[in-house]
Regions:
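Conserved beta-strand hairpin/beta-sheet module of binuclear metal-dependent hydrolase folds
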Residues: 45-95, 187-201
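Active-site neighborhood of phospho(di)ester-bond hydrolases with catalytic His/Asp-centered motifs
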Residues: 80-82, 105-113, 130-133, 178, ...
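C-terminal regulatory/interaction regions
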Residues: 270-313
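Divalent-metal (often Zn2+) His-rich catalytic cores of metallo-beta-lactamase-fold enzymes
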Residues: 190, 218-273, 277
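Hydrophobic h-region of N-terminal signal peptides that target proteins for export
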Residues: 8-18
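Metallo-beta-lactamase
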Residues: 41, 46-47, 135-179, 183-185, ...
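N-terminal pre-domain segments of enzymes
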Residues: 20-42
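Active-site HxH/HxHxD metal-binding segment of metal-dependent hydrolases
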Residues: 94-167
């Protein structure tokens, strides 16, 4: 049952413009570190009138949460991001049916990665899917390689290259592209009246930056633009969703983490060592205690090296 709960030139700019980072706290994105178990999920949280966040365990077994935004209106429901499997996404769909008789009319693919799109086949076939052009192309390529009998990849019919405003009844919803970050086509969803921003994988709560397909210095610039959006509540793509003040503080902390990781990658690149050797000399400070650091740190260093070497296109 669902549980309810009421690069080098950029770095000085990033650190200077980010608000002062709060003092380090004993926090974690891992559910086990908070005394929770898989039986405590999925979870639905109401964050504003007719606005909810659905959270369930990451489909990769990493022990932290994947989050989706649900916006209920008199003209239908908009969902931002899905879950990693058809079964878990069906739980999301079923939860929406318990919330409202209104149909799911729009699904926004903010992240093209499988942990957010792997279950999209469970959404109603009548729903209109949106993504960035880059994510649409990535999902088209993936769909071409779908295996018989496997889950079908849904390719969005609509694309958002810069921004698009959707009006469902009296609710205004902005879909925005602020630049490459965790992927080549990250989107964010903003509710201007409610001052809510769903940042998807551009922001993860207390998880060491995951850069497998990222654009490190561009991610820092994208975070700067996202920070300029007038939002009291910022919802991450992964990690716990807490009160607005805590989420603001965690967003600031994540921006500092990104700056630190990229700066350390630049320093290590200057040692003229292979990335696989350089990572052993990394100085992460408090971020070594962030969830996923052991897995994500070597990937981040390699990705920064690739960017500095001109290998990212």
């Amino acid at each position: 049952m669902t549980r309810y709960l009421p690069l080098a030139l950029l770095l000085p700019v990033a650190f200077a413009s980010a608000p002062q980072q709060p003092q380090p706290r004993s926090r974690s994105a891992a559910i086990a570190d908070r005394g929770l178990t898989p039986a405590d999920f999925p979870k639905l949280q109401k964050i504003a009138d007719r606005v909810y966040v659905f959270s369930d365990l990451h489909s990769g077994g990493f022990g932290y949460l994947t989050n989706d935004l649900i916006v209920v209106t008199d003209a239908g429901v908009l969902v931002a991001d899905g879950q990693g499997t058809p079964a878990v996404t069906q739980k999301l769909v079923d939860e929406i049916r318990r919330l409202t008789p209104q149909p799911i009319v729009n699904v926004v693919v903010c992240s093209e990665h499988g942990d957010h799109t792997g279950g999209n086949v469970s959404f109603p076939s009548s729903a209109v899917f949106f993504s960035s052009p880059a994510s649409q192309a990535a999902l088209q390529a993936q769909a071409a390689n779908d295996r018989p009998g496997g889950s079908r990849t849904i390719v969005p019919a609509e694309t958002v290259a810069s921004s698009r405003t959707i009006r469902l009844g009296t609710t205004e919803i902005d879909i925005v592209y602020n630049g490459r970050a965790h992927t080549s086509g990250d989107l964010e969803v903003s509710l201007p009246a409610e001052k809510i921003l769903f940042a998807s994988e551009v922001f993860t709560n207390h998880i060491f930056p995951s850069m497998r397909t990222a654009y490190p210095s561009e991610w820092i610039a994208t975070l700067e633009r996202v920070a300029a959006i007038d939002a009291a509540m910022i919802v991450p793509g992964h990690g716990f969703v807490e009160d607005p003040a805590t989420m603001q503080a965690e967003f600031v902390a994540f921006r500092h983490a990104m700056g630190t990781v990229v700066a350390e990658g630049i320093r290590l690149h200057g040692l003229n060592l292979p990335a696989s050797d350089a990572v052993a000399q990394a100085r992460w400070g408090e971020y070594v205690r962030w969830t996923g650091s052991e897995r994500n740190a070597p990937i981040a260093i390699q990705r920064v090296f690739d960017e500095l070497d001109g290998k990212l296109k």
